[in-house]
């Protein structure tokens, strides 16, 4: 199973329990050539027919330009801080989370090197 970036999903679920060290996955992502040469890198930690949990690492200043999604989205900042814009603009820091409904225009900018978990329903 591959994620939307064409990469192999790390932990496709098949019924049952799975545990993942997010800290270890952040270290792994930051040790790749994609991280060294780019501004962000991501991998699906869990992906099945109903759910996608994406871990993304972003360098300071990295942006996800304004876009919309087909399903609600929750963004949990694991480390660092981001500027999240969806009508209003908020700084979301490590340990904080923001959620939006489907089809809401939004954008993200890393205020510092950051890691975020994006949780979306598959529709």
Language model features: what each stretch is:
Residues 60, 70-87:
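Glycine- and acidic-residue-biased ligand/ion/polar-headgroup-sensing regions
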Residues 74, 112-123:
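A short hydrophobic beta-strand segment most commonly corresponding to one strand
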Residues 81, 105, 114-115:
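Structural motif
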Residues 87-103:
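Short acidic-glycine-tyrosine-enriched beta hairpin
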Residues 35-41, 49-68, 102, 123:
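Conserved short histidine dyad/triad with adjacent acidic residue
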Residues 1-50, 85:
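A short, N-terminal "cap"/entry segment at the start of jelly-roll beta-barrel domains
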Residues 78-79, 93-94, 112:
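A cytosolic small-molecule/anion-sensing beta-strand core signal
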């Amino acid at each position: 199973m591959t994620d939307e970036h064409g990469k192999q999903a790390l932990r496709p679920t098949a019924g049952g329990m799975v545990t993942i060290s997010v800290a270890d996955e952040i270290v792994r992502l930051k040790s790749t050539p994609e991280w060294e040469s780019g501004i962000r890198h991501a991998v699906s930690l869990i992906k099945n027919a109903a759910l996608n949990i994406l871990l993304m690492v972003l360098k300071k200043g990295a942006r996800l330009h304004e876009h919309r999604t087909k399903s609600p989205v929750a963004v949990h900042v694991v480390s660092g801080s981001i500027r999240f814009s969806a009508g209003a603009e908020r700084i979301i820091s490590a340990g904080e989370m923001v959620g939006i409904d489907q089809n809401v225009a939004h954008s993200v900018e890393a205020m510092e090197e950051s890691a975020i978990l994006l949780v979306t329903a598959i529709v």
